[in-house]
């Protein structure tokens, strides 16, 4: 594996990571450093393991029987994969937004407040401030401030995805995982999400899975190319897209493969 992502402080360190769906070996000996306050994109053909890798970062796989990870994922030096590490604290530090917008069946306000209430005790005034802060971070406040008590499902698809991002940042995580957040959105909504990602990296470490090569090139500082569960190449996005070290990477990016 070619690895040229050496600048900036590491927020997440992945060491000798292997992942299994039952007996199927889905992720093979991945080693990489995710840089702090940068956007890292995972690219690769369908089934290559990029979403699986993303979901190891907050142990989302534990919701499903028969799945297991081996190795280390260090968040500021703390191994997230050990049983000693509280899973609820991991998910407070490592937020996630899924491919399809998933607003909770409750008001816009309560969508934001729900996760906060799990981890903090805030007064009504403090919660109001947090809700406004999170919706502002997701560039949604001005669009919904007069209808906070309407259902989150009443919003458009693009607004729903920004609501999910606001919900993710409301608990003030350190890392934000985005699993193909724009795949179900129109170009205008996609552009808003991409602008939002550029803003979020100033306060969060962002990792995004995308099938869209142009999106990876536009949004990310670092890019990881995966194939058949292996990390084939990882480095600065400009280098990966302009002068990749491996022919396999070049073939995928230029459309000759995948």
Swiss-Prot record:
Gene Ontology biological process terms from the UniProt entry: phosphate ion transmembrane transport
Catalytic activity: phosphate(out) + ATP + H2O = ADP + 2 phosphate(in) + H(+)
E.C. no: 7.3.2.1
Keywords annotated in UniProt: ATP-binding, Cell inner membrane, Cell membrane, Membrane, Nucleotide-binding, Phosphate transport, Translocase, Transport
PANTHER family the UniProt entry points to: ABC TRANSPORTER I FAMILY MEMBER 17, PHOSPHATE IMPORT ATP-BINDING PROTEIN PSTB
Family to which the UniProt record says this protein belongs: Belongs to the ABC transporter superfamily. Phosphate importer (TC 3.A.1.7) family.
Protein name: Phosphate import ATP-binding protein PstB
Annotated organism of origin: Bordetella pertussis (strain Tohama I / ATCC BAA-589 / NCTC 13251)
Gene: pstB
């Amino acid at each position: 594996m070619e690895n040229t992502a050496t600048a900036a402080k590491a927020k997440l360190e992945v060491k000798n990571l292997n992942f299994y769906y039952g007996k199927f070996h889905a992720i093979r000996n991945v080693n990489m450093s995710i840089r702090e306050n940068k956007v890292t994109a995972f690219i690769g053909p369908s089934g290559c393991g990029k979403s699986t890798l993303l979901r190891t970062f907050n142990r989302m796989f534990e919701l499903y029987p028969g799945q297991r990870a081996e190795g280390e994922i260090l968040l500021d030096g703390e191994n997230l994969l050990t049983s000693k590490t509280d899973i609820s604290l991991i998910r407070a530090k490592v937020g996630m937004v899924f491919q399809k917008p998933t607003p909770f069946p409750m008001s816009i306000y309560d969508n934001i407040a729900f996760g906060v209430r799990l981890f903090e005790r805030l007064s009504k005034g403090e919660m109001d401030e947090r809700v406004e802060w999170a919706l502002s971070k997701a560039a949604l406040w001005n669009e919904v401030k007069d209808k906070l008590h309407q259902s989150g499902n009443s919003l458009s698809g693009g607004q729903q995805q920004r609501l999910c991002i606001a919900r993710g940042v409301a608990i003030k995580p350190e890392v934000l995982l985005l699993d193909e957040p724009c795949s179900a959105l129109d170009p205008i909504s996609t552009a808003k999400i991409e602008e939002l990602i550029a803003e979020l990296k100033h306060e969060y470490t962002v990792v995004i899975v995308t099938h869209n090569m142009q999106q990876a090139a536009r949004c990310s500082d670092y890019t990881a190319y995966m194939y058949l569960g292996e990390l084939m190449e990882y480095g600065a996005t400009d280098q990966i897209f302009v002068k990749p070290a491996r022919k396999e990477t070049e073939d995928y990016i230029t459309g000759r493969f995948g």
